[in-house]
UniProtKB/Swiss-Prot annotation:
Name used for this protein in its record: Diguanylate cyclase VdcA
Function (record text): Diguanylate cyclase (DGC) that catalyzes the synthesis of cyclic diguanylate (c-di-GMP) via the condensation of 2 GTP molecules. Is involved in the modulation of intracellular c-di-GMP levels. Cyclic-di-GMP is a second messenger which positively regulates biofilm formation and negatively regulates virulence in V.cholerae, and is proposed to play an important role in the transition from persistence in the environment to survival in the host. Overexpression of vdcA results in increased biofilm formation, and reduced motility and virulence.
Any single Gene Ontology cellular-component annotation: plasma membrane
GO biological process: cell adhesion involved in single-species biofilm formation; negative regulation of bacterial-type flagellum-dependent cell motility
Enzyme class: transferase
Annotated site residue numbers, Transition state stabilizer: K219
Record: residues binding Mg(2+): D214, E257
Binding site for substrate: N222, D231
Textual note on the cofactor: Binds 1 Mg(2+) ion per subunit.
Organism: Vibrio cholerae serotype O1 (strain ATCC 39315 / El Tor Inaba N16961)
Domain of life where this protein originates: Bacteria
């Protein structure tokens, strides 16, 4: 039960939350409100510490960071999984309902057979039925009882299978929310997270630079060593990017062999210097092929770096960065553009 003090506290928090969300360009959704109410309430110190770090690095709260903090500190496991679980369980329930309807229909038919059979048997003395006629009634009962037993067994098997399937879904759905933000192969934020964060930073009017990088000769590496080795390279580069990112620079897997780095509050000059340090670090990588045991070096990447300018949209900013990236490819790869 809410006390007068609780009410006063919640009202005071409300007055703080909404302006704070507006200040940091946070969309007014129930999830975001719950996150920021908890932040203002200072109910979870670790949440506040991580949020303060995000605000320091970005000057606002990017959508991916906010969603990640919400899932980590506020959302219950059931809430995280409920939407997909509901959809899958509805399918299972539909299948079970259909089986139950069939079984009930069979049961109703069997009841009619039993009634008719008993009536036929009551005529044994009245109509002097022959042994053969009596055996016909009994055979009909035996046959129909086998059918109903088969139908009931089928329903039981489906119920058991559904129970196992629901258990499996519960295990898998624990990853659903994470998968919505993270790339499963690299462990980095995914394209969806990138689009949301970059869009927010652009429209907040903040200084931000974008680094796009693409692994050189990736198709040839795949062809020569196989796709599993290609996956090893992607994971190795992702791990290297994570180790190098600091001061708010965040790494994303943009798609395929292409990655993106968002650098808030960084000028083109600083972002280019950082990209150059990343390029040098990647070219020192050696990845061991797990199948053959062979170590492969000479892994390089090409880079395109841009700083947001007045009038930039998400599409135009990415387009300029990609243009410079492919210029780096055309000039011989393993370089950062602009020079």
């Amino acid at each position: 039960m809410m006390t007068t003090e609780d009410f006063k506290k919640s009202t005071a928090n409300l007055k703080k939350v909404v302006p704070l969300m507006m200040k940091h360009h946070v969309a007014a959704t129930p999830v975001n409100y719950a996150l920021w109410y908890t932040y203002v309430d200072q109910a979870i110190p670790q949440l506040n510490a991580e949020m303060d770090s995000v605000l320091k690095n970005f000057g606002l709260c990017p959508p991916a960071s906010g969603e990640h903090l919400y899932q980590q500190y506020i959302a219950t496991k059931a809430e995280t999984n409920i939407n997909q679980l509901r959809a899958n369980v509805e399918v299972l329930l539909g299948e079970i309902s259909s089986s139950m309807s069939d079984t009930l229909s069979d049961t109703s038919s069997f009841a009619n057979v039993i009634d008719k059979s008993f009536k036929d048997l009551e005529r044994v003395e009245q109509d002097n039925l022959s042994i053969e006629e009596v055996m016909t009634v009994i055979r009909r009962l035996v046959s129909d009882s086998k059918d109903i037993r088969h139908s009931t067994n089928f329903l039981n098997n489906q119920l058991n299978a559904a129970t196992l399937e629901i258990s499996r879904l519960k295990e898998q759905l624990a990853k659903v929310q994470k998968d919505a933000l993270f790339d499963s192969l690299s462990g980095l934020y995914n394209r969806r997270a990138f689009d949301g964060d970059m869009f927010t930073l652009i429209h907040a009017g903040q200084q931000v630079s974008l680094i796009m990088l693409d692994i050189d000769h990736f198709k040839a590496l795949n062809d020569n060593y196989g796709h599993l080795f290609g996956d090893q390279i992607i994971r190795a580069i992702a791990k290297r990017l994570q180790s190098l990112c600091r001061d708010g620079v965040t790494a994303y897997r943009y798609g395929g062999e292409e990655f993106a780095l968002i650098a808030p509050h960084k000028s083109l000059r600083i972002a280019r210097q950082f990209a150059e340090s990343v390029r040098r670090s990647i070219e020192k990588l050696t990845v061991k092929d797990r199948r053959s045991g062979q170590s492969v070096g000479s892994i390089t990447a090409s880079f395109g770096v841009v700083e947001k300018i007045e009038g930039d949209s998400l599409e135009s900013l990415i387009g300029r960065a990609d243009g410079l990236l492919y210029e780096a490819k055309n000039l011989g790869r393993n370089r950062v553009m602009p020079l």
